[in-house]
């Protein structure tokens, strides 16, 4: 009996047991099997830009998309945000089940991510050089504490320019005070310095 003479239901059952790669190999062996290429499901993860032209894209269960803004295909299941992503994630993505983003992006976008979606925050923050990463606590990235300088009562929670100006002024003032203190210490030492008396040798 020729394999091509099998009922469609049996052929589809055979195809469904294969991996995606083997499905394609099997269905491209002859025109009879190629007929089923848009009648089976595919479960590997595919880049949207490489499959968007296919007529059977709805049969692909996992579609990956690399986003730089909110123009994201509605059939996206795996979303990766660019480090230059500009958007809010407010557009509905009914099939989304996985998202990869930076810790910094998560601080601002987490409220628009549904609870059932798997979140990958291991994508390191691109704004911090890897050689300096050990000096930063990633949980604090993007946060600005609501507190004051203990001595000068400067409110930190202001605009970045104001904060930098205050911090620089505060630092410069401390440097100048240290210089004055060092100069005063030098003058005191010079005035109060005492030399030991030279003892004369007695002749016996």
Swiss-Prot record:
F-box domain location: 1-46
Compositionally biased residues, Basic residues: 171-183
Spans annotated as Disordered: 161-184
Name assigned to this protein: Putative F-box protein L168
């Amino acid at each position: 009996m020729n394999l091509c003479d099998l009922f469609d239901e049996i052929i589809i059952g055979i195809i469904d047991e294969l991996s995606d790669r083997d499905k394609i190999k099997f269905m491209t062996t002859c025109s009879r099997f190629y007929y089923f290429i848009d009648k089976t499901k595919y479960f590997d993860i595919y880049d949207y830009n490489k499959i968007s032209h296919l007529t059977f894209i709805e049969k692909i269960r996992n579609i990956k998309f690399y986003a730089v803004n909110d123009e994201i295909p509605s059939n996206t299941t795996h979303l990766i945000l660019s480090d230059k992503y500009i958007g809010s994630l407010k557009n509905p993505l009914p099939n989304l089940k996985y998202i990869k983003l930076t810790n910094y992006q998560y601080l601002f976008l987490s409220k628009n991510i549904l609870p059932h979606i798997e979140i990958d925050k291991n994508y390191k923050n691109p704004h911090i050089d890897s050689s300096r990463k050990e000096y930063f606590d990633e949980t604090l990235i993007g946060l600005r504490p609501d507190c004051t300088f203990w001595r000068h009562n400067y409110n930190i929670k202001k605009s970045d320019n104001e904060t930098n100006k205050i911090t620089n002024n505060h630092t410069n003032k401390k440097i100048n005070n240290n210089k004055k203190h060092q100069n005063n210490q030098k003058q005191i030492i010079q005035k109060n310095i005492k030399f030991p008396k030279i003892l004369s040798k007695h002749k016996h």
